[in-house]
Amino acid sequence: MKKIIFGLIMTAIVVYCASAAGIREEKIMQEANTGAKMDLIGHEWKLIGVYIDGVDTQYRREIQPKEIIICFTLNFDGQIVSGVGAPNRYSAPYTIGENQNISIMMVRSTLMASLFEPYNLTEHDFFTYIQNSHSWRVLNGQLELNSKTADNKNVRLVFN
């Protein structure tokens, strides 16, 4: 009987230590993700470049018609990414994973007709790229989102 009780106590101690280590490791990862996530939050990111399979698509904010200069923006709060397409406002839930992975769910947007089309990027493509984003980084004050096109080409969106 003593051996059974001793065995149960030892098992409980091992399980407790293992779960405490797991909780501690998870807390460290959450703190790291929270710190990295803070780089995203509180800033209105404006799209300045789009690269598909490493090739510059020549999208430039400064050459857009003045009527649509405020387009293709990105704002992160704790749980929702939102912004302006061209011309529609959009939002979507998102999650940040380990190693700067990101998952942006289905984008929902208003349904206004566009009077002016941005050069070299359609709103539909922008929403597709946002929705297909899989990783991110902030480098030299610029946000880079890595994504895929509808036909699975690599996309890099650069925001300032």
What are these regions (language model features)?
Residues 4-13:
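Sec-dependent N-terminal signal peptides
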Residues 17-160:
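Lipid interaction determinants
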